[in-house]
Amino acid sequence: MSKTVQPLHQLPRPKAQFLLGHSAYFSKDPLQFLYECSHQYEGLVPLRLGFSKACFVFDPSAVMEVLRERTIFTKNTPGWRAIQTLVGLGLLGSDGDYWARQRRLTQPIFHHQRIVAYGDLMVQATDRLLQTWQDDTVRDVHQDMMHLTLEIVMQTLLSADLEGETAQAIAHALDMSMQWFSQQQKQGFLLPPTLPLPSNKRYFAAVKAMDNLIYQLIQQRRDSDADTGDLLSMLLQIKDETDGSQMSDRQLRDELATLVLAGHETTANALAWTWMLLAQHPQVEAQLHEELDSVLQGRTPTVADLPQLSFTQTVLKESMRLYPPVVLLARWSEQDYVVGGCEIPKGCVMMMSPWVMHRCDRYFPDPLAFKPERWQDDLEKQLPRGVYIPFGEGPRICIGKGFAQMEATLILATLAQKYQLSLTDGQTIEAFPSITLRPKNGLRMTLYARSNEG
């Protein structure tokens, strides 16, 4: 006997406004709205965003089904069309056969043996940041992490100096893109980005300035034919095994923009939230310092130390549970399709939230508590797939996952070995969901040099 399939519109849902549907609730506080939906309803929740059909998915098996079926549930959503204005048809912005080819071409540069070669560079950049830190001073640690991860990605990707013209143009375009995307998000992506509004003009001017310098750099590399050992050199050398073709300048530009955005913002924000959580939980911070002192004995960490820095890695894993770098994943249904016993209509925006999944008490007892020790008994292997998804899941899981994990661990170990950080009084820390999840007003912290480094 076949299982009954229920149409999406028949499922229970929150009360909607006449014209706006659920848009007003979603725009006001999307994380809280979806979190409340997950506590009031089951698995799949039909929503209406203006005149658009949507479905919030938080059943793990249904989440995995949506993320696995990449040809049925594509990224062709209004939000991703906005992101495409920055990353073009890079891995973040493409779909279908084109995406599959780009993923196949790009995958080799992120093999483990390649990325470990960048470990020393990551630590050296972190040491340069340490030289600017002083005991008993206040820093915006979020800005420090942004600056540091941008320096690392510029060096590993382009062998570029952070103070150089190309790096400065890219940094400006990224900053403008976050502001612009947030405005688009608040408007529900209803206004075409081509409208001659001042905010649109400023944003596209910044992207154009970045593009001009990136194309110049690509041309210089092609003319010199030099192998600088960075990721751009690898991308220039890669050939498609099926037909011997290589990436065009436009494809290279799109992948560079994608890798800078994904490799810079996400790691910086994950580290910023980690510093906040450590300051709020001194017993966890003390355990972290104990591991660093025992393993490193006061010396600079290396990639070879990573297997011994297990608690350091669980601290980051727990931080990304509570504050995932990306809080909302969206897909567009290209056809009618059954998910979790429910018929999803064509043209429906499927929304999944790592923020909500990671705070579910069914899988994480005391879900709002910061407890790195919960990961020490292979919890991740025991969880159903689709529950813990800080890097996404399925065929489109983050290609730079290994790079980001290595980078974050080395940065945290290098800095926490030398300093203890404390939150300054009087600041309001607010999680601000844009393309990534960042502290809205920065993160001001007082630095205290540690004297017991082993």
Residue ranges and their predicted role:
Residues H22-E42, N212, Q216, R299-G340:
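Conserved cytochrome P450 K-helix E-x-x-R motif and the immediately C-terminal K′/meander segment
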Residues M352-L379:
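Conserved cytochrome P450 K-helix/beta-meander segment immediately N-terminal to the heme-binding cysteine loop
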Residues S2-R101, V116-R128, A206-A209, Q335, ...:
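N-terminal membrane-proximal hinge/A-helix region immediately C-terminal to the signal-anchor transmembrane segment
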Residues T266-E291, G402-Q417:
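Cytochrome P450 catalytic-core helices
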Residues S2-L11, K75-I83, S94, Y98, ...:
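Cytochrome P450 heme-thiolate monooxygenase catalytic core
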